[in-house]
Amino acid sequence: MKRLLLLAASFFLLMGMSAQERRADGAGYERKVVVEELTGTACGWCPRGLVGMKMLRDLYGDRFIGVAVHQFNATDPMYTPDYADIDWSDGGLKGAPCCMIDRNGEIIDPFYGSAGGMRDVAKDFERAMEEKAVLGVTVSGEWNADYTAVQTTAQVEGTEAGRYEMVFVLVADSVAGNTQRWRQLNNYCGYTRDSFDDDLLAPFLQGGSYGQQGDYCKYIFEDVLVGSSYKYKGTQYSNCLLYTSDAADD
């Protein structure tokens, strides 16, 4: 059994308000942006989403809050059925990989973004960062003795009155397994840079470190949704207890 590694207990608010911290200069809050991505190990084009999410993390650091929702295929060992009711299909027009930024209602590509160009999702992210942050959030988390649950607490302060819904999300990094179930389908392995000329996609292309492994490649997954307070939907609470799950290597 492999224990998932908790690296972040991400907290965000719906209505487009993501987790913020007061700026060091005292001028309001520094906006952080949530990107929820639909993905799955049986999604052959999802390496594009893996690349896009990593790019956002590398570019924007802790201002990026990534939530990789593995709901494309139930055979995915990271599959999580209990999450928000998001219409990822956008009325049947979209498929995986796709993402939504700060619950703005727009389903876009996690690499091409809304504009459709290489790496253009960064432009969508930057527009979201420019929006005013009206709430400040401080989150803390503590594991129990055997690392099967984490107690989370949030402190919220704001500059504007309003009704907000709070959601706790537990994500994990460096998630991997040794069996076939953990391998990522990679449709890019048969293509060269003549088709996809981008350094970030290159490892998944023909001859790349992942592409040379064939149709399925071994990958270490980041920002993986492990649990959320949606499991307790309708329950009032001051603290939220989120449970992890042990993931089998098979």
Model-based region annotation:
Residues Q20-R22, G52-D58, A122-R127:
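Intrinsically disordered, low-complexity boundary segments flanking structured domains
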Residues D246-D250:
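A short, hydrophobic C-terminal helix/tail in secreted or cell-surface proteins
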Residues M1-A24:
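Bacterial Sec-dependent N-terminal signal peptides
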Residues F11, A27, V35, D58, ...:
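A generic structural signal for short, solvent-exposed coil/turn residues
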